[in-house]
């Protein structure tokens, strides 16, 4: 997600020119009116208004571009390689810059939400401390800890990273709900969530956005690899880039 100073034109009218530029890859369109979170003023929560979130979705529904008056984002359910994601993002940012000429980006970032499933990896009988490094497990990482006794065990970390980047990490065991597209029945599965939000703040010129994202991405790989054990790494059958 990349943030920029509010562009009122985006809120005031449908993004026709931007859609024309990316419609070949993202033919589906939806507009959502979202309620902004309340802000605290004078010790009281003050209700805020709404914001238009324009969404452009690929034909297979695996990729989505979100555009509001203050940010643009690309998300996917099927992330496999950085190179593909980066190429798509580069085309989207080029179309956005041409349509709206933003002054600069105030925040550029990448967010990776990982859900590790033991059964899917053939690790049903493994304990999380065999798969996740101790620093990401908290008390559950102790050798004598009973994994099933923990009702909640969430770690929240904010740290400075090389190259001027920062990260927010949220991790811990949880339940992931899966919905069968045919029957619409839902099923919950135990997973370990690793939510990594990497970003750079400050005024980033348009022509420096891609280099800034490369710095952010460069930190993502080391963070991810540092969070998992060799056992989990090998079970995921990583491919060479």
Language-model features: locations:
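Short glycine-rich, low-complexity/disordered patches
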Residues: 29-43, 98-113, 144-152, 223-241
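Hydrophobic alpha-helical segments and helix pairs
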Residues: 60-100
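Long, compositionally biased interface segments
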Residues: 189-241
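N-terminal low-complexity, intrinsically disordered segments
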Residues: 1-67, 202, 208, 238-241
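Aromatic/basic-lined ligand-recognition segments
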Residues: 51-57, 107-184
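Conserved short hydrophobic interaction patches
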Residues: 25, 88, 92-99, 216-219, ...
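Glycine-rich, often proline-containing surface loops adjacent to acidic residues and nearby aromatics
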Residues: 1, 63-79, 105-113, 188-201
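Short amphipathic alpha-helical segments
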Residues: 14, 18, 81-88, 92, ...
């Amino acid at each position: 997600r990349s943030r920029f100073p509010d562009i009122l034109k985006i809120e005031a009218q449908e993004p026709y020119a931007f859609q024309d530029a990316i419609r070949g890859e993202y033919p589906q369109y939806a507009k959502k009116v979202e309620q902004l979170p309340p802000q605290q003023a004078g010790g009281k929560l003050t209700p805020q208004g709404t914001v238009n979130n324009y969404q452009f979705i690929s034909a297979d529904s695996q990729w989505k571009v979100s555009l509001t008056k203050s940010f643009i984002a690309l998300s996917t359910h099927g992330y496999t390689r950085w190179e593909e994601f980066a190429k798509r993002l580069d085309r989207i940012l080029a179309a956005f810059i041409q349509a709206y000429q933003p002054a600069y980006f105030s925040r550029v970032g990448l967010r990776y939400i990982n859900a590790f499933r033991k059964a899917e990896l053939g690790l049903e009988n493994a304990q999380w401390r065999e798969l996740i490094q101790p620093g990401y497990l908290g008390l559950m990482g102790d050798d004598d800890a009973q994994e099933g006794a923990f009702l909640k065990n969430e770690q929240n970390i904010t740290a400075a990273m090389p190259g001027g980047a920062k990260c927010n990490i949220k991790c811990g065991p949880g339940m992931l709900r899966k919905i069968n597209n045919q029957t619409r029945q839902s099923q919950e599965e135990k997973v370990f969530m690793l939510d990594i939000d990497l970003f750079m703040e400050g005024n980033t010129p348009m022509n420096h956005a891609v280099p800034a994202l490369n710095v952010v991405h460069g930190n993502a790989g080391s963070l991810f690899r540092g969070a998992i054990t060799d056992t989990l790494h090998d079970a995921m059958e990583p491919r060479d880039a």
